Amino acid sequence: MKKIINPWKGLEGYNCFGCAPNNEAGVRMEFYEDGEEIVSIWKPRPEYQGWIDTLHGGIQAVLLDEICAWVVLRKLQTTGVTSKMETRYRKSIDTKDSHVVLRASIKEIKRNIVIIEAKLYNKDDEVCTEAVCTYFTFPQEKARK
């Protein structure tokens, strides 16, 4: 796996909840490229629980949406916005776990619409949450601005 350098790190005003390394309230994700997949290894924290020692479903959705955005960024060399996200919660995630792993890849491309599949695994490599995200992507010229 190859670590992806965050191109916005150090940019004034950059405070993304998903990936800004200095956003104390954020989830501060980091990403790696592994073949066709984008991967993130993330440490659950107690402040993100919904129920006692259980990772909040909304935080799980944030993690899945964010990794899908990085698939668009890295694999298509552009940016976009989420237009639809279907999420399936299969198993709870313990906030005391040492880590979770997220993996995402492109399923389909139709012009500027990209379908991305993402999975969230617990420390035992069990699929806990799955998402299919539909992204509306921007032309590269617009994304650079």
Predicted regions and their residues:
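A conserved, well-ordered hydrophobic junction motif at loop->secondary-structure transitions
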Residues: 39-65
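HotDog/MaoC-like acyl-thioester-processing domains
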Residues: 1-8, 94-96, 105-145
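Hydrophobic beta-strand-centered segment that forms part of the acyl-chain substrate-binding groove
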Residues: 67-101, 106
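Residue-level recognition of well-ordered beta-strand positions that form the cores
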Residues: 41-43, 86-88, 103-105, 119, ...
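N-terminal short leaders/motifs
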Residues: 57-77, 117-118
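Hydrophobic core residues within well-ordered beta-strands of beta-rich domains
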Residues: 36, 81-83, 100, 114, ...
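Non-catalytic linker/capping segments at the edges of enzyme domains
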Residues: 1-47
